Amino acid sequence: MRCRTRQRISERSQACVVKVSACSYSVCMATNLDELNAQSAYAPLPPIFAKLGLAYDDVLLLPNETDVIPSEVDTSTHLTRKIVMKAPVLSAAMDTVTESEMAIAMARNGGIGVLHRNLSIDDQAAQVDVVKRSESGMITDPLTVNPEVTLADLDKLCGKFHISGLPVVDKENKLVGIITNRDMRFIASEDYDTLKVKDVMTKENLVTGPSNISKDDAHRLLAQHKVEKLPLVDEEGHLTGLITVKDFVKTEQYPDATKDEQGRLRVAAGVGFLGDAWQRASALMEAGVDVLVVDTANGEARLALDMISRLKHDSAFDGVQIIGGNVGTRSGAQAMIEAGADAVKVGIGPGSICTTRIVAGVGVPQLTAVYEAAQACRAAGVPCIADGGIHYSGDIAKALVAGASSVMLGGTLAGCEEAPGEKVLLHGKQYKLYRGMGSLGAMAPRGKKSYSKDRYFQADVTSSDKVVPEGVEGEVPYRGPLNAVLYQMLGGLHQSMFYIGAHNIAEMPERGKFIRITDAGLRESHPHDIVMTTEAPNYSGFHNN
């Protein structure tokens, strides 16, 4: 009798092993997150529970048959309905990540920067202007200087816009000369306050071109006369434009740069939806911004959706694309689309400096959030931007396979030279300050106003000690110039496209298949059983601490 009982127990145990093995095998063969969710070993949950939420670290991509060469893949993608980028990356609208220097570097490397809004309207509009003037096929409204201006004032103007010289015009906008750093090279700085532009400018034998000059003819004139700036004038001598030799050099140096129809670098900027948000949006539009990002912690807020709709229905903003965010669900993305958004930004709390999921208990693990939102976006032909949670280049690939068109990077870029965060030395290593826009520091007043509190719906909180933060402040390792960081991040994406057999971004959701992994699988994926002596440029254990 005892033997028969043992036999039955043994048979039941074997059956359980077979059942678990079959389940494990089916998970390995899953093609998308819906299938992964359906394979849960748990009993069905009541309706109040959503499906299983997965983060990037919960999955890997399965290798696939491939004829792809990593160096030949096409990483171009739609940022919005109308704007295409060569690299599927944006820098985050954070005050320790993106100001004009980062935005310029991002656009030159094929992505785009989103200027943060934690500053005055005039200052943010000036940042847009700096980016748009940084290079151009032809500057149609060049900065100019009056002959009566002192060299001291001229020097300040050139320093502000990082330029080496300016056309000199009279009150009727007629060209009367040009002044460059060559004209000022041998003038003592103590004379800058007394000498005027007219005293040192070049006014004889000016090399100019007609308003309708071709690019090739302009290049020929610059080379023939060995000058760096070519003012363009009409028949009456009025200044109509300016072409510089540096723009030809930069076009060759940065062939994948994200540019507008006039050859200027593209730039995006964040706006809110309360208070002076409309005045901010209007000022940014007048400064030449290409994309406005209606930037809030919960994109499903009625006021945020109304702001998107208002911008899309105002003809003054016809030349500006509108991105809405952030959302974490399919229904949230659908609401953005119905409001008229040209792209939807996805991410509720995945960032390394965000505490929303802990403080508010709200959020969606990022891989699931991207996958769900992408279902609505794909059906409507609207690009989806995965914002946050990217630690390594492999995470970019996972986001794109899940349906994102591009990714937004914050902490990954905060350590770059171009990021505005302060550089500090800690234990003999260099770091840069990085903070969430929901941190106490970011929401603190700047002068008489706080520009970040309304992102977290706390604009009505007048006392700093009453603010409920949804972010933290810290430091990230200094990583050097942006182009080196992006080279490694995009290089990893190229390798991923090779492994899954995708020639371009559009093929990634079709070719990519996820396998869900355990904690042991994640540990096995990272370097293990070794003491690292030299860090690779694309891998650091920093995120695992």
UniProtKB/Swiss-Prot annotation:
Protein's name in the database: Inosine-5'-monophosphate dehydrogenase
Native source organism of the sequence: Bifidobacterium longum (strain NCC 2705)
GO MF entries: IMP dehydrogenase activity; metal ion binding; nucleotide binding
Keywords, comma-separated and alphabetical: CBS domain, GMP biosynthesis, Metal-binding, NAD, Oxidoreductase, Potassium, Purine biosynthesis, Repeat
InterPro entries registered for this protein in UniProt: Aldolase_TIM (IPR013785), CBS_dom (IPR000644), CBS_dom_sf (IPR046342), IMP_DH (IPR005990), IMP_DH/GMP_Rdtase_CS (IPR015875), IMP_DH_GMPRt (IPR001093)
Subunit structure: Homotetramer.
Pfam families, sorted: CBS, IMPDH
Binding site for K(+): 349, 351, 354, 524-526
Associated pathway: Purine metabolism; XMP biosynthesis via de novo pathway; XMP from IMP: step 1/1
Residues annotated as the enzyme's active site: 354 (thioimidate intermediate), 455 (proton acceptor)
Residues at which NAD(+) binds: 295, 347-349
Catalysed transformations (reactions): IMP + NAD(+) + H2O = XMP + NADH + H(+)
Cofactor(s) recorded in Swiss-Prot or TrEMBL: K(+)
Coiled-coil features, chain-numbered ranges: none
SMART domains: CBS, IMPDH
Domain of life where this protein originates: Bacteria
Entry keyword annotation includes ATP-binding: no
Binding site residues for IMP: 352, 387-389, 410-411, 434-438, 470
Domain called CBS: residue spans: 138-194, 201-258
Chain's role: Catalyzes the conversion of inosine 5'-phosphate (IMP) to xanthosine 5'-phosphate (XMP), the first committed and rate-limiting step in the de novo synthesis of guanine nucleotides, and therefore plays an important role in the regulation of cell growth.
Single Gene Ontology BP annotation: GTP biosynthetic process
Activity regulation remarks: Mycophenolic acid (MPA) is a non-competitive inhibitor that prevents formation of the closed enzyme conformation by binding to the same site as the amobile flap. In contrast, mizoribine monophosphate (MZP) is a competitive inhibitor that induces the closed conformation. MPA is a potent inhibitor of mammalian IMPDHs but a poor inhibitor of the bacterial enzymes. MZP is a more potent inhibitor of bacterial IMPDH.
